[in-house]
Amino acid sequence: MIHSRLIIIGSGPSGYTAAIYASRALLHPLLFEGFFSGISGGQLMTTTEVENFPGFPEGILGPKLMNNMKEQAVRFGTKTLAQDIISVDFSVRPFILKSKEETYSCDACIIATGASAKRLEIPGAGNDEFWQKGVTACAVCDGASPIFKNKDLYVIGGGDSALEEALYLTRYGSHVYVVHRRDKLRASKAMEARAQNNEKITFLWNSEIVKISGDSIVRSVDIKNVQTQEITTREAAGVFFAIGHKPNTDFLGGQLTLDESGYIVTEKGTSKTSVPGVFAAGDVQDKYYRQAVTSAGSGCIAALDAERFLG
């Protein structure tokens, strides 16, 4: 069994920032990059241009930003492993963590496994198709991209998050279409009224996108009316999934307190979870903001909390 004083599960802005702070505090953390969001390094590894992370006035590629963070953490003494932690035991001290390759133990643990955007299996939406080439799951992250400016954009969903995305996208697109397979929304009445009163938003009821097409970027969508089965093709520059996120917490086996949506519950103003010595950072405990910079900040908090815990 391999022991480390501090193990960080997950990478991305929260995991790497936690590692930078922890390694500078001479905690010699072991970081499992993992593939919880589908790729080692988190969701930013599938993002092209990141324009809202401080310090990069011209923007920076998502993979470049993550590689920079990783290099910084490693330079200060973090050891990284490209493995997934598949199970944990927080009932014993030191904590026991298992990957497919090895068993590890630690005195403190930071969970930074993120949350994965729920996606529909639509032709054209895959990672090797138009994902991050016009198809995305974060309007705030990607909406200002030049490929969306003054173009027709489509949001899939019917809840508050879908309408928030649609309202945000009206700043950039020429028109925003909300595609919903039912004839009424799940969103709050106040949010629905705001969207209904926005002349740049149109609702496509009883409809679903069945195909996304383009060349190097998205150019069109096929939309099916679920009642008549009629399919129409429309010009489109962007398709935004707004059907929720799933926090990557299944591997915890119910050992930490989660909220009703599966996010890790932390003590207000800290990264402390329901188990002393276990801390959470990033999107795995943040259902509201989900930004690279807020994730990085929470990673810093988790490292400082872990340092104080370890003494």
From Swiss-Prot:
Question: Which species is this UniProt entry from?
Answer: Chlamydia pneumoniae (Chlamydophila pneumoniae)
Please give the biological process terms from Gene Ontology that the record holds.
removal of superoxide radicals
Q: Which InterPro entries match?
A: FAD/NAD-bd_sf, FAD/NAD-binding_dom, Ferredoxin-NADP_redctase_2, Pyr_nucl-diS_OxRdtase_2_AS, Thioredox_Rdtase
Assembly and partners are described as:
Homodimer.
Query: Could you name the domain of life of the organism this protein comes from?
Result: Bacteria
List positions binding FAD. Answer: 33-43, 283-292
Question: Where is this chain primarily localised?
Answer: cytoplasm
Q: What are the protein's UniProt keywords?
A: Cytoplasm, Disulfide bond, FAD, Flavoprotein, NADP, Oxidoreductase, Redox-active center
Q: Tell me which PROSITE patterns the record gives.
A: PYRIDINE_REDOX_2 (PS00573)
The cofactor required is: FAD
Family statement drawn from the similarity comment of this UniProt entry: Belongs to the class-II pyridine nucleotide-disulfide oxidoreductase family.
Q: Under what name is this protein listed?
A: Thioredoxin reductase
Gene Ontology molecular functions? thioredoxin-disulfide reductase (NADPH) activity
Is this entry keyworded Protein transport? no
Q: Which GO terms describe its cellular component?
A: cytoplasm
UniProt keyword Disulfide bond, yes or no? yes
